Amino acid sequence: MSFIKKIFLSSRSSEDGLFFSKLEKILGFKPLNLTHFRRAFTHRSMNKLDEKGNPMNYERLEFMGDAMLGSVIAAHLFNMSPTGDEGYLTKMRSKIVSREHLNELGKDLNLIQFLESKVTLQNFGENIHGNLFEAFVGAIYLDRGFVYCEKFIHKKVIKPYVDIDKLEGKVISYKSLLIEWCQKEKRVFHYDIYEDEDAGKLKYFGVKLSIDGKVVAKARATSKKKAEEIASKRGYFVFQSEIDGK
């Protein structure tokens, strides 16, 4: 074995050892196959392939993690809410696995530290944290199976964050809530969206929310979706007493 190859293998071994230690601290148990976890933090921009020539990135693991989170949380809600009907259980599960919540979980575990990407972090939106969390859960399932994956979800998601009473009052989407109320009360609503630029020439989207022909809220954000949600939240507080039935 050449001297250079020995140095490379030694460096790789040291790198894997550090990665293993950090994973074990987050997981609470030892990972068996680091390849699954390497994949969970590899962005498609790396253009990596596995030994079979298939793309090696976290996108497929996101799918697996999403399925695991959904099934474990569904089972927990089913057992904890014996009187809840299908609609109630579905709504509660949606609140737990909302994109906002998954992003928070990814941030809390600092999974972004493991990301391999040719895209700079500044060019990723908030959802990268939730995407990595889902992929991480998928990697746990492939590495240790359902039982370990279920334990991890209970420890990191359900136990610290799932409070049924608090979740019942949590709003996932102010836009959906406001539209539902407007339709129920036969109110006419309209989102007027327009492009805007700041001094640094960054593109922003402005939104004016009108209800019954009157502008009740305005917002500005880097995406149409964010601007609509912010305007909807402000609109909600204008009509909160009516919407909440107080």
Swiss-Prot record:
Primary enzyme class: hydrolase
One Pfam family from the record: dsrm
Start and end residues of each RNase III domain: 20-145
Molecular function GO labels: double-stranded RNA binding; metal ion binding; ribonuclease III activity; rRNA binding
Residue stretches making up the DRBM domain: 173-241
Extent of the signal sequence: none
Protein name stated in the entry: Ribonuclease 3
Record organism: Flavobacterium psychrophilum (strain ATCC 49511 / DSM 21280 / CIP 103535 / JIP02/86)
